[in-house]
Amino acid sequence: MDDAMESDNELQRTVYHGLLPHADIDPLLRENGDFVIRKTDKDGQIILALSVRWNSQLLHFVVNQDESGYYYFETHKEKTICDLINWHKTTKNPVSVKSNAKLISGITRQSWLLDHDEVQLQRKLGEGAFGEVYLSQYVRSNKVIDVAVKTIREEASRLARLKFMKEARIMRKFSHPNVVKIMGIMVYENPLMIVMELCPEGSMLSYLRRNIPVNSDLKLRFATEASAGLAYLESKHCIHRDIAARNCLLSEQLEVKISDFGMSDERRIIYDEKLEKVPMKWLAPETMQQRIFSPKTDVWSFGVLVWEVYADGKEPYPGLSNIQARAKIVVQNYRMEMPKTAPSAVSKLVYRCWKTDPSERPSFAEIHRKLKALKRK
């Protein structure tokens, strides 16, 4: 079936959307008869499928192939997939009798879908549970741009691939100077890749630890710019769920860029029964006790991030294990003391972020406004 796609150049250039999942396809198919061809996972096997909008529903049909190499949906067969689609379009015969779904408009590939040959991986920058991040070169319109490319291993589970694509889908909706920009994704072959702007100074955490002591003006700037990015995400109803200095990247000019949207979601509130792989020392008490994430739990985590900035990148709750920190926060209502180098106005703001009652915590819009005013003084 892969050979069919490689030899069918017209299909490759037009309606073929690779391994783009259902959740990404859905918003592309708006009108009756809109359709794409894509790859999908069925019972552990990668197959070709047709997705079509019909009577407001998104329908999916397997592209079948007989022993002679001919392609078909139900009965009519053609030598190429392109011929099969064109036959259904021109004759107006439905894809299946039961659905009566007809093919009217093929949706051409989106500008954010990139070809693998547009990117050259150079050097590994790091790795995670499901793949690696590479310093890479992105070549388009005879321009070469340094980028970061996040990959997912071929052997990753279907669920891991869907999470990876969800991260890219969330990032595509954002455009802010303090949020990492996504250039596009590569879904036409393995490995799947997310192409992002390069932040050459690495994480804020590593910068703080490499450059002790960072001057107070830069520390305030870090906190202010992080709050700007988070205020923007708040306005987009995005709960990040993993706010920490390690997930803030720095540009060449040391601009803060909020990154790592692997745990993020666009909801008002999230219940997570398992709390797997969550960074305990950055969690709000209601997350620890009730498994709840909300914009206000992000505000709590931001308070811990600001503590990290003024503590020169030390781990929060020094000397305490995760279990000990949890017990002190929840049972004893313990709060860390802000480092003495922090301006009193910043410390007061952080202590408000750590209020037990989420409704008493400030919004990111307010936090950013107050930090920005301090930065001007």
Predicted regions and their residues:
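Regulatory alphaC helix of protein kinase catalytic domains
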Residues: F164-R169
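Conserved short submotifs of the Hanks-type protein kinase catalytic core
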Residues: E189-S203, Y207
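Conserved catalytic-loop aspartate of Hanks-type protein kinases
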Residues: D298
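Catalytic-loop of the protein kinase fold
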Residues: E234-S251
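A short, aromatic-enriched beta-strand patch in the conserved N-lobe beta-sheet
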Residues: G184-I185
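Activation segment signature within eukaryotic-like protein kinase domains
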Residues: F222-A223
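Domain-scale recognition of modular recruitment/scaffold domains used in eukaryotic signaling
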Residues: M1-F130, E154
